[in-house]
């Protein structure tokens, strides 16, 4: 069942792009939670939260720029600290992930 759920998630355009990197799925989970909960974690804090298969900071920032260019994620300014940029998944990706997860419950 877990394999089927994972394959369903990979059918979401944004999700399969995240999974092109060894740390991508963990990053996806973090950004999903940050977006849903409106958490105030900046880019550097997000990088530090990745525990498995972590890359070097320049490679991470390059991947973030690629995801932004593809419209999968975007940056917003923190309301708490103006110098902090927050990463968010786009709403279409969130909706597709939620749809895939809710179809499992049926």
Question: Where do the protein language model's features map onto the residues?
Answer:
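Minor-groove-contacting beta-hairpin "wing" of winged helix-turn-helix DNA-binding domains
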Residues: 80-89
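Short amphipathic alpha-helical elements of helix-turn-helix/winged-helix folds
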Residues: 30-37
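Alpha-helical ligand/cofactor-binding cores
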Residues: 62-66, 88, 94
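A short, conserved structural fragment
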Residues: 68-79
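Short acidic, hydrophobic short linear motifs in intrinsically disordered regions
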Residues: 37-50
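Short alpha-helical segments that sit at the start of domains
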Residues: 2-30
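Short amphipathic alpha-helical interaction segments
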Residues: 53-69
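Short, amphipathic alpha-helical interaction segments positioned at domain boundaries
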Residues: 91-106
């Amino acid at each position: 069942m877990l394999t089927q759920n994972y394959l369903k998630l990979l059918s979401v355009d944004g999700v399969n792009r995240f999974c092109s990197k060894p740390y991508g799925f963990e990053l996806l989970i973090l950004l999903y939670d940050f977006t849903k909960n409106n958490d105030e974690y900046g880019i550097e804090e997000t990088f530090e939260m990745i525990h498995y298969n972590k890359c070097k900071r320049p490679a991470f920032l390059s991947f973030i720029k690629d995801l932004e260019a593809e419209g999968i994620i975007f940056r917003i300014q923190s309301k708490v600290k103006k110098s902090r940029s927050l990463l968010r998944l786009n709403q279409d990706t969130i909706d597709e992930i939620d749809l895939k997860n809710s179809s499992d419950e049926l």
